[in-house]
UniProtKB/Swiss-Prot annotation:
PANTHER family: 50S RIBOSOMAL PROTEIN L32, LARGE RIBOSOMAL SUBUNIT PROTEIN BL32. Belongs to the bacterial ribosomal protein bL32 family. It holds the Pfam family Ribosomal_L32p. One of its GO terms (molecular function) is structural constituent of ribosome. Keywords: Ribonucleoprotein, Ribosomal protein. GO terms for biological process: translation. Transmembrane segments: none annotated. NCBIfam families: rpmF_bact. The gene is rpmF. This is Large ribosomal subunit protein bL32.
Length: 68
Protein backbone atom coordinates (compact mmCIF):
# COMPACT_ATOMS: atom_id res chain seq x y z
CA UNK A 1 0.00 0.00 0.00
CA UNK A 2 1.27 3.49 -0.82
CA UNK A 3 2.48 5.55 2.12
CA UNK A 4 3.49 9.23 1.87
CA UNK A 5 7.27 9.64 2.04
CA UNK A 6 7.01 13.17 3.44
CA UNK A 7 4.28 15.29 4.96
CA UNK A 8 2.42 17.50 2.49
CA UNK A 9 2.30 21.04 3.82
CA UNK A 10 -0.87 23.12 3.92
CA UNK A 11 0.55 25.40 1.26
CA UNK A 12 1.38 22.60 -1.18
CA UNK A 13 -1.97 20.89 -0.53
CA UNK A 14 -3.89 24.12 -1.15
CA UNK A 15 -1.89 24.94 -4.28
CA UNK A 16 -2.77 21.50 -5.67
CA UNK A 17 -6.44 22.12 -4.93
CA UNK A 18 -6.46 25.60 -6.48
CA UNK A 19 -7.85 24.27 -9.79
CA UNK A 20 -10.58 22.09 -8.25
CA UNK A 21 -13.18 24.86 -7.88
CA UNK A 22 -16.49 24.42 -9.72
CA UNK A 23 -17.34 26.94 -12.43
CA UNK A 24 -20.87 28.33 -12.56
CA UNK A 25 -22.90 27.76 -15.71
CA UNK A 26 -23.08 30.62 -18.21
CA UNK A 27 -26.51 30.30 -19.85
CA UNK A 28 -27.40 32.37 -22.88
CA UNK A 29 -30.84 33.41 -24.08
CA UNK A 30 -32.17 31.61 -27.16
CA UNK A 31 -32.77 34.22 -29.89
CA UNK A 32 -35.76 32.24 -31.20
CA UNK A 33 -37.83 31.47 -28.09
CA UNK A 34 -36.10 33.36 -25.27
CA UNK A 35 -35.45 30.31 -23.09
CA UNK A 36 -32.09 29.90 -21.38
CA UNK A 37 -29.73 27.48 -23.12
CA UNK A 38 -26.07 26.49 -22.96
CA UNK A 39 -23.80 28.45 -25.31
CA UNK A 40 -22.99 26.66 -28.59
CA UNK A 41 -25.71 24.05 -27.96
CA UNK A 42 -29.12 23.38 -29.49
CA UNK A 43 -31.99 24.95 -27.54
CA UNK A 44 -33.88 22.26 -25.66
CA UNK A 45 -37.16 24.16 -25.79
CA UNK A 46 -37.46 24.92 -29.51
CA UNK A 47 -34.69 22.86 -31.18
CA UNK A 48 -33.04 25.85 -32.89
CA UNK A 49 -29.33 26.47 -33.30
CA UNK A 50 -27.85 29.50 -35.09
CA UNK A 51 -31.35 30.64 -36.21
CA UNK A 52 -32.09 27.27 -37.87
CA UNK A 53 -34.29 24.43 -36.64
CA UNK A 54 -32.02 21.41 -36.37
CA UNK A 55 -34.10 19.21 -34.04
CA UNK A 56 -37.82 18.73 -34.38
CA UNK A 57 -39.32 19.10 -30.90
CA UNK A 58 -42.40 17.01 -30.19
CA UNK A 59 -45.13 18.03 -27.76
CA UNK A 60 -44.57 16.73 -24.24
CA UNK A 61 -47.22 14.41 -22.81
CA UNK A 62 -48.03 14.55 -19.12
CA UNK A 63 -47.96 11.01 -17.76
CA UNK A 64 -49.90 11.95 -14.62
CA UNK A 65 -53.00 12.98 -16.58
CA UNK A 66 -52.96 9.76 -18.62
CA UNK A 67 -52.87 7.62 -15.48
CA UNK A 68 -55.75 9.43 -13.78
Amino acid sequence: MAVPQNRVTRSRRNMRRSHDALVAANPAECPNCGELKRPHHVCGACGHYDSREVVAVTAETDLDEDAA
